[in-house]
């Protein structure tokens, strides 16, 4: 870095991509072991190594950006493009689930009784917990925008308050979704309705947990004065991701809960 004459970040060799890949392998293998052999040892090992990798990789990035100043405006521009492309890939990921749902529901086969929901399936009432979940996520979208505007204006206390409210709403959403799953009158093995419902809403729930983790990291970073009104891409990326999760839920609610029931 001593004689560098450009604005790009020359990254040092890092073990975290390798440990992250290995922990992902352990987690997926552990899930298979849990499903088929009722053993959670490999899954717990995978989750532990994944959490350790996340912590150490995040720590290194914070060190490089906040304390060493490697994240120049040029580097931040590249990171913005990267986050946008990542969110586009996630949109395509969820498009596959919506495709599966509409493929099955718009032309139900005789095996399903020629109707949707299939014969024998009692769908959830869209005006009960799902509607509450929708209002919770919409409220969290408002509070994350409040946090972002407070940060832009240099209002640290309001930013922390708004971010805390967003995290609390995200956790509340996850708890509501868990209770809904627990009380649902159908399971993932109840044909195409159960599988499309639980895979689509389950992956969305996973994204809410990931987004909440992202926001919790931002909360602790803000407590340590890591963000300024002009240098806060970590928070901006988390806010974009949260808005994406919000919009996907609206499509899920309208398609699967409301129209699909």
UniProtKB/Swiss-Prot annotation:
It is found in: Mitochondrion inner membrane. SUPFAM superfamilies: Cytochrome c oxidase subunit III-like. The chain crosses the membrane at residues 16-34, 41-66, 73-105, 129-152, 156-183, 191-223, 233-256. Pfam families: COX3. GO terms for biological process: mitochondrial electron transport, cytochrome c to oxygen; respiratory chain complex IV assembly. Residues 35-40, 106-128, 184-190, 257-261 are mitochondrial intermembrane. Keywords: Membrane, Mitochondrion, Mitochondrion inner membrane, Translocase, Transmembrane, Transmembrane helix. Its main location: mitochondrion. Its EC number is 7.1.1.9. Residues 1-15, 67-72, 153-155, 224-232 are mitochondrial matrix. One of its GO terms (molecular function) is cytochrome-c oxidase activity. It is an enzyme of class 7 (translocase). It comes from the Eukaryota. One of its GO terms (cellular component) is respiratory chain complex IV. It is a multi-pass membrane protein. It catalyses: 4 Fe(II)-[cytochrome c] + O2 + 8 H(+)(in) = 4 Fe(III)-[cytochrome c] + 2 H2O + 4 H(+)(out). Belongs to the cytochrome c oxidase subunit 3 family. Component of the cytochrome c oxidase, the last enzyme in the mitochondrial electron transport chain which drives oxidative phosphorylation. The respiratory chain contains 3 multisubunit complexes succinate dehydrogenase (complex II, CII), ubiquinol-cytochrome c oxidoreductase (cytochrome b-c1 complex, complex III, CIII) and cytochrome c oxidase (complex IV, CIV), that cooperate to transfer electrons derived from NADH and succinate to molecular oxygen, creating an electrochemical gradient over the inner membrane that drives transmembrane transport and the ATP synthase. Component of the cytochrome c oxidase (complex IV, CIV), a multisubunit enzyme composed of 14 subunits. The complex is composed of a catalytic core of 3 subunits MT-CO1, MT-CO2 and MT-CO3, encoded in the mitochondrial DNA, and 11 supernumerary subunits COX4I, COX5A, COX5B, COX6A, COX6B, COX6C, COX7A, COX7B, COX7C, COX8 and NDUFA4, which are encoded in the nuclear genome. This is Cytochrome c oxidase subunit 3. It comes from Tragelaphus imberbis (Lesser kudu). The gene is MT-CO3.
């Amino acid at each position: 870095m001593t004689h560098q004459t450009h604005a790009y970040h020359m990254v040092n060799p890092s073990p975290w991509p390798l440990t992250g890949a290995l922990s992902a392998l352990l987690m997926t293998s552990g899930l298979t072991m849990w499903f088929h052999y009722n053993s959670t040892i490999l899954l717990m090992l995978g989750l532990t190594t994944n959490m350790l990798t996340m912590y150490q990789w995040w720590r290194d990035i914070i060190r490089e950006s906040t304390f060493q100043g490697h994240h120049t405006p040029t580097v931040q521009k590249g990171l913005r493009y990267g986050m946008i492309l990542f969110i586009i890939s996630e949109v395509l990921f969820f498009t596959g689930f919506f495709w599966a749902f509409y493929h099955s529901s718009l032309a139900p086969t005789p095996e399903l009784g020629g109707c949707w929901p299939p014969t024998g399936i009692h769908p959830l009432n869209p005006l009960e917990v799902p509607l509450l979940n929708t209002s919770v996520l919409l409220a969290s979208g408002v509070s994350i925008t409040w946090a972002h505007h407070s940060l832009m204006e240099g209002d640290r206390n309001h930013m922390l308050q708004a971010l805390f409210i967003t995290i609390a709403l995200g956790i509340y959403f996850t708890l509501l979704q868990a209770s809904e799953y627990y009380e649902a009158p159908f399971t993932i093995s109840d044909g195409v309705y159960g599988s499309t419902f639980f895979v689509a809403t389950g992956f969305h729930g996973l994204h809410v947990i990931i987004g909440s983790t992202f926001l919790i990291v931002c909360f602790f970073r803000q407590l340590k004065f890591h963000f300024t009104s002009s240098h806060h891409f970590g928070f901006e990326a988390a806010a974009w991701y949260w808005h994406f999760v919000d919009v996907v839920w609206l499509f899920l609610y309208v398609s699967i809960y409301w129209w699909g029931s």
